[in-house]
């Protein structure tokens, strides 16, 4: 299994994320984080919300994979508990997660993905990545009946 988290952000590897990456390997899952922040995003965010959203889509589109499940994290999307999240992931070998910038996703991009919400609350990119990585590890623990999820 391979899970990739694509994010509109300048940098990533947080210590806790590295721990979850290591823990996911025991289940045969490579957990990868890819931060994308081309110059056009910084410029677009200064101009308008619509242009910013378009720039996020342009950054993410090359990573949409028709042979994977593509999941856009969106605060207004479907949400569920850890068991529902594990059910959603268990039948896929390739899973791509997308975390937009401050202005969110274009509707067009959301139509190319399955949308999922971590919470009704708004998180910084760093916190969202940590929560997502922990939930991926928890989902794997549920799938493989590991005692981490009690």
Curated annotation (Swiss-Prot):
Question: Keywords for this entry?
Answer: Cytoplasm, Methyltransferase, rRNA processing, S-adenosyl-L-methionine, Transferase
- Where along this sequence does the record place binding of S-adenosyl-L-methionine? 71, 100, 118-123
Could you say which enzyme class this protein belongs to? transferase
**Cross-referenced Pfam families:** SPOUT_MTase
**GO cellular component: a single term:** cytoplasm
Intracellular or extracellular location(s): Cytoplasm
Task: Kindly give the InterPro entries that the UniProt entry links to this protein.
Answer: Alpha/beta_knot_MTases, RlmH-like, tRNA_m1G_MTases_N
Provide a Gene Ontology MF annotation, just one.
rRNA (pseudouridine-N3-)-methyltransferase activity
**Family annotation (Gene3D superfamilies):** 3.40.1280.10
Q: EC number(s) of the enzyme?
A: 2.1.1.177
The reaction(s) catalysed by this protein are:
pseudouridine(1915) in 23S rRNA + S-adenosyl-L-methionine = N(3)-methylpseudouridine(1915) in 23S rRNA + S-adenosyl-L-homocysteine + H(+)
How does the annotation summarize its subunit structure? Homodimer.
Q: What does this protein do?
A: Specifically methylates the pseudouridine at position 1915 (m3Psi1915) in 23S rRNA.
What does the sequence similarity comment in the record state about its family? Belongs to the RNA methyltransferase RlmH family.
Name-wise, this protein is: Ribosomal RNA large subunit methyltransferase H
């Amino acid at each position: 299994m391979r899970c990739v988290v694509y994010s509109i952000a300048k940098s990533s590897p947080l210590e806790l994320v590295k721990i979850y990456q290591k823990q996911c390997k025991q289940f045969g899952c490579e957990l990868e984080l890819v931060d994308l922040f081309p110059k056009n995003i910084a410029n677009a965010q200064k101009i308008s919300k619509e242009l910013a959203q378009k720039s996020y889509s342009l950054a993410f589109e090359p990573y949409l994979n028709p042979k994977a499940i593509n999941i856009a994290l969106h605060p207004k999307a479907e949400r569920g508990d850890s068991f529902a999240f594990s059910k959603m992931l268990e039948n896929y070998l390739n899973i791509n997660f997308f975390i937009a910038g401050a202005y969110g996703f274009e509707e067009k991009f959301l139509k190319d993905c399955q949308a999922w919400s971590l919470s009704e609350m708004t998180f910084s990119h760093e916190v969202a990545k940590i929560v997502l990585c922990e939930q991926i590890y928890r989902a794997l623990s549920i799938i493989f009946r590991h005692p981490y999820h009690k």
